[in-house]
Amino acid sequence: FKNIERLWKQEYINYLRLTTDTAFNVLKKKNQLRFDTLIQHIKKVKEEIAPKQNLVWSNYLDSIFLEDQLLRRKWQKAANAYGYSSNEAQKYWPEIHLKDSLNLIAVTNFINNYGWQSKEVVGQTGNSTLFLVIQHSDSATQEKYLPILKKAVKQNKASPGDLALLLDRLSVAKYGYQIYGSQVHEDTATKKTVFFPIKNEKKVDKRRKKMKLQPLSEYGRLFGITYKPIE
């Protein structure tokens, strides 16, 4: 239910899928009244913002978002329980990579044909999908679409936070350090989740604030990391 409430607040309007996909049956059985109430809220949001959006595009990108996240959530659950390098977590990666390659074809074709569309046109979830699929691609593809994302941020069509995450991903791959502290990994010795090295770490929260990201201590808690800012 929390995920549905989050999607509603982000103007998720794939109402048809929410009401017909059997994957949501477990929530209906758990609390039919609460599910119906949330669906009505989502329907209302859809009716209010639909005239502003391209529903074909938003529904298309929403479906890609679900495919991108479904296996990753299963992987994250296994990683939290057994560790990132465990067989229980690693078994998901072949299928994740396959999904990523298919989603990348779809999203790059979309961007090449229609540009980096704003949340006003494709919804918050659709807009996030464009970033997530590029973020989950290879470095060459990330480099190729980085200028397009930078331009989209300047035009208020994309989130500065998304740009920060992509820049960090590229920086870690190239240099082994990051700028905004968004990238984490499992320490091979302690098996704990830690941040990749952060360049000029004393000023990381100032840089994060400029990109509209929460303080690193708050972000770290999402991964079970206790972070104390450097004085």
Task: Give a label for each model feature.
Residues 14, 23-26, 176-190:
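Beta-strand-rich cores of mature extracytoplasmic or soluble domains
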Residues 1-126, 136-140:
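Preference for long, solvent-exposed alpha-helical segments and helix-linker "stalks"
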Residues 108-172, 177-179, 183:
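Mature extracellular/secreted ectodomains of secretory-pathway proteins
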